């Protein structure tokens, strides 16, 4: 482990370097000015502290922007423990700034998978005054890892044999080993965690997909709020965030000229739309791949070529996966690519690209160029560059989305946490979406910062539309 661990009555953290705290604090101050939604919520609720003494575990990229979210949750009363949701996404100066305030944080850039899952367990382990180990009352999740760990741990205590089944990946084997260890070291721990757990708010598409799968199987243990599908998250973070941060990641990793290159974007959902726009803005010739005829038609109407991955092999210079699905780029695709092709992912997990299969190929030489940039040379002499080991390129090779767009997402997260706690006795064990009036509130909080002035409906106009003058203005089924 290359992290610094400190556990005392006044500090509890595992980070890279606490001396980076001053730098982190300076960037936090800058970010706060770019995050009007979070800061407004902080001011509004600082006196009433709606999350007073609520134990919250966060599993979300430990960036400067996330640090502003953490301090917002703390300022409205929460007792917070945090880990990153990706082995490469932590900004070490952000983690140091949070650790320096006394908030337990367990994250550093470049964790191993074993370290990552240990950090996740650390983040969800709270100690009661009598010394009993317990868990969070609320969870902020990104990708569903905390939710997965608690559910699998609880199932193990109730007779599940999943941990003894063959693992489908190295990461799954790490999770199973951790659960076996906890079963020995902390008997009955997951039952105590579930007893107090009141809800989770989920940040990203992949995590939401996991939640719906668990709910459909009748195994969801708590109410969950799908933050990802709030309009002010999916249509802003996923779209406009990727539009800026994808090119940033590619440029920092490879210093590559994008103009004139053939770039393949796999998937044309919100993330794919932002990614395709990012590459086209720099002059790349973009090819989109899609399974969905509606998304394919959208891409075509925007002027993109829509074709298969196979049709691009040997001619494309850059590949970006955005789908949230697995095996999008296979090892056979990688071997058939143009020499020196750049391959990366901006979907949540690394299984969009068959990285494990690539590493298992015989006679393939791996050359590390710099952190998160690896060159794989095939026996025929051709090579590809794999960025961030197939994980999120914008966070692994750059610093992720800009602060302003993350203020939208994190304002939603904060409101979701408040909503889950205030309605903890009425919410059922199913997946919810934040109501439209809160979605509109989040948008409204960001308008002044960019000089937007809204038109106001007259009473007659509002009556004609069948809405309130103050909103909400659209029905839930409206597609923005």
UniProtKB/Swiss-Prot annotation:
A Pfam family reported for this protein in Swiss-Prot or TrEMBL:
AdoHcyase
Which reactions does this protein catalyse? S-adenosyl-L-homocysteine + H2O = L-homocysteine + adenosine
Q: Which HAMAP family match?
A: AdoHcyase
| Compartments, record wording | Cytoplasm
Enzyme Commission number(s): 3.13.2.1
**Which molecular function terms from Gene Ontology are attached?**
adenosylhomocysteinase activity
Q: Which cofactor does it need?
A: NAD(+)
From the broadest rank down, the organism's phylogenetic lineage runs: Bacteria, Pseudomonadati, Pseudomonadota, Gammaproteobacteria, Lysobacterales
Pathway given for this chain reads: Amino-acid biosynthesis; L-homocysteine biosynthesis; L-homocysteine from S-adenosyl-L-homocysteine: step 1/1
Name of the protein this chain belongs to: Adenosylhomocysteinase
Q: Which organism is it from?
A: Xanthomonas oryzae pv. oryzae (strain PXO99A)
Binding residue positions for NAD(+): 204-206, 238, 267-272, 290, 325, 346-348, 394
Q: Which keywords belong to this entry? A: Cytoplasm, Hydrolase, NAD, One-carbon metabolism
Q: Which family does it belong to?
A: Belongs to the adenosylhomocysteinase family.
Q: Report the protein's function.
A: May play a key role in the regulation of the intracellular concentration of adenosylhomocysteine.
Q: What class of enzyme is it?
A: hydrolase
* Main subcellular location: cytoplasm
Q: Which InterPro entries does its entry note?
A: Adenosylhomocyst_ase-like_sf, Adenosylhomocysteinase-like, Ado_hCys_hydrolase_NAD-bd, NAD(P)-bd_dom_sf, S-Ado-L-homoCys_hydrolase_CS
Q: Which CDD domains has this protein been placed in?
A: SAHH
| Keyword Transmembrane helix among UniProt keywords | no
Q: Which SUPFAM superfamilies does this chain map to?
A: Formate/glycerate dehydrogenase catalytic domain-like (SSF52283), NAD(P)-binding Rossmann-fold domains (SSF51735)
SMART domains in the record: AdoHcyase (SM00996), AdoHcyase_NAD (SM00997)
Q: Which residues bind substrate?
A: 63, 142, 203, 233, 237
Domain of life, per the record? Answer: Bacteria
Q: Which GO terms describe its biological process?
A: L-homocysteine biosynthetic process; one-carbon metabolic process; S-adenosylmethionine cycle
List GO terms (cellular component aspect).
Answer: cytosol
